[in-house]
Design a protein with these regions (language model features):
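Short, well-formed alpha-helical segments that are part of the catalytic scaffolds
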Residues: 11-25
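Acidic helix N-cap motif at the loop->helix transition within catalytic regions
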Residues: 14-18, 42-50
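Short beta-strand/loop segment that forms part of the nucleotide-sugar
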Residues: 20, 24, 30-39, 56
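Conserved donor nucleotide-binding strand/loop of the catalytic core
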Residues: 31-34, 45-72
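A conserved acidic beta->alpha catalytic loop
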Residues: 37-45, 85-86
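Short aromatic/hydrophobic "clamp" motif used to bind/position activated sugar donors
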Residues: 78
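Conserved donor NDP-sugar-binding/catalytic core segment of glycosyltransferases
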Residues: 90-120
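Hydrophobic helical membrane-anchoring modules
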Residues: 170-225
Length: 225
């Protein structure tokens, strides 16, 4: 099984050098790395032009960027990674084991840990992991992975401005329950620190509640930004 790791970016010049260093071992393990730019203006794309990394360009919008990357991918497994999230060292092996030929699941996600100074971020990450196990809904911060055939069968990511990960999870859980890898991905807590942990918690829950009530993602995206 070959893994294609798809990373949407937009103006991530400060993060790119460390991201590339984190991904080099996976390149050496024959993972395909596809970075899809959404119109960066800070030189991000030029920084990525190294052997082993494929650069694609798409219109702005994370869902659209990930779909473009998936269309380009040659792997049998797709792993969608946010630019500010770090995979564990053996991520490729863990994913292959999770989706082995005798597995009943066609998709899954990692546990997540939110990095940052506030101790409350550990609690937030813990609650995210519990919620995913109970609801079978994963978020992009948890590095969703899926067999490419099932991703295509589910219709790919809906090209909306927000909640595309929730919609994909809803479609995939009809096909099978997700596999949760107990190892952790580490995602940045910068948004939480800038805007305040409790303020961000309330915002996220309000957005999810409003989305559940039927408010379009296009209307919610402005509040998220």
């Amino acid at each position: 099984m070959k893994i294609s790791i798809i990373i949407p970016i937009l103006n991530e010049a400060r993060r790119i050098p460390q991201l590339l260093e984190e991904l080099k071992p996976l390149v050496q393990n024959n993972c395909e790395i596809i970075i899809v730019d959404g119109g960066s203006e800070d030189g991000s794309v030029e920084m990525i032009e190294h052997p082993g990394f494929i650069v694609e360009r798409a219109g702005c919008g994370r869902a659209r960027q990930m779909n473009v990357g998936a269309a380009r991918a040659t792997g049998t497994i797709l792993l969608f990674l946010h630019a500010d999230t770090q995979l564990p060292d053996t991520a490729d092996l863990l994913v292959k084991q999770a989706l082995s030929n005798n597995s009943l699941s066609c998709w899954g996600h990692f546990n997540v840990c939110i990095a940052g100074r506030p101790k409350m971020l550990r609690v937030v990450g813990f609650m995210m992991n519990i919620r995913s196990r109970v609801t079978n809904i994963a978020t992009g911060d948890q590095a969703i992975f899926v067999k490419k055939t099932d991703f295509m069968a589910a219709g790919c990511f809906p090209e909306q401005l927000l909640m595309e990960d929730i919609e994909l999870s809803k479609k995939l859980r009809i096909i099978s329950r997700p596999t949760c890898i107990n190892s952790y991905v580490i995602t940045s807590g910068r948004r939480w620190e800038v805007y305040g942990v409790w303020r961000t918690i309330f915002l996220m829950w309000r957005l999810r509640w409003d989305y559940w009530r039927g408010i379009p993602a296009s209307q919610l995206a402005g509040r998220y930004q």
